[in-house]
Amino acid sequence: MNRYTLKEIEENLGVFFNNHTLLKTALTHSSFGNQFKDAEYNERLEFLGDSVLQLCITEYLFNNYKHKTEGELTKIRSLIVCENSLYEIAKKINLGSYIRMSKGEEITGGRERISIQADAVEAIIAAVYLDKGIGFVRDFILLHFEEIINKAINNEIVLDFKTKLQELLQKDGEVVIQYELTKFEGPPHRRKFFTNVVIDKKLMGEGSGYSKKEAEQNAAKQALDILEGKHE
């Protein structure tokens, strides 16, 4: 990773680091560390970044939404501090193209993997915190998460269970995921849709909702719950 690449990343982030080693580490996946033994990878920074992000978002919500209950604030925070939101940030700054990883990881789709990009965002937050301090990283987080915060407050975030399901299944190789509309009922202005999700010709989830998209998301969520339960 040369200094021109680092400058490009810094411009995308809106942060210019004093310690570029922190930025390099934040962008280094563990697979790269396994391939190049001297490389420090980003898992420890990710651990710290998660806590920094939680603190800054919690503090912001606490100070700015005094009419919200603890339960409401917790729900809002869970929509902001989650893998899907982190992935949205990663996409905006084209983070996937800068992450250092092994050739094997890249060949199997690692550069597009949601979890890898989300983890890298948390690692970058930690790197900014260590390099610039809590005041700077607070402003950095609020700048990049502003749109997501507003959507969470206005209840406009739809959890993308379909993408998460695809991400989970990609770990085991190529699979065929199909969403099948089985029926709908109710008047046109309040129609309810029912959908199955079929994975490699096997029924794995059922969902319903007042749009086809909502029904598919709920079917994907049920499939995720089943699959993640099997992995425990």
Curated annotation (Swiss-Prot):
Instruction: Tell me which domain of life the UniProt entry assigns to the organism this sequence originates from.
Output: Bacteria
Per UniProt, the keywords (alphabetical) are: Cytoplasm, Endonuclease, Hydrolase, Magnesium, Metal-binding, mRNA processing, Nuclease, RNA-binding, rRNA processing, rRNA-binding, tRNA processing
- Domain spans labelled DRBM: 160-229
Which InterPro entries does its entry note? dsRBD_dom (IPR014720), RNase_III (IPR011907), RNase_III_dom (IPR000999), RNase_III_sf (IPR036389)
Every RNase III domain range: 6-133
Citing just one GO molecular function, the answer is: metal ion binding
* Cell compartments where the protein resides: Cytoplasm
Catalysed transformations (reactions): Endonucleolytic cleavage to 5'-phosphomonoester
The biological processes this protein is annotated with in GO are: mRNA processing; regulation of gene expression; rRNA processing; tRNA processing
What enzyme category does the UniProt record give? Answer: hydrolase
**Which positions are annotated as binding Mg(2+)?**
E46, D119, E122
Q: Chief subcellular site?
A: cytoplasm
Give a Gene Ontology cellular component term annotated to this protein.
Answer: cytoplasm
Cofactor annotation: Mg(2+)
Enzyme Commission number(s) from the entry: 3.1.26.3
Q: Where is the active site?
A: D50, E122
Assembly and partners?
Homodimer.
User: Any idea what job this protein has?
Assistant: Digests double-stranded RNA. Involved in the processing of primary rRNA transcript to yield the immediate precursors to the large and small rRNAs (23S and 16S). Processes some mRNAs, and tRNAs when they are encoded in the rRNA operon. Processes pre-crRNA and tracrRNA of type II CRISPR loci if present in the organism.
Q: Which family does it belong to?
A: Belongs to the ribonuclease III family.
The name of this protein is Ribonuclease 3
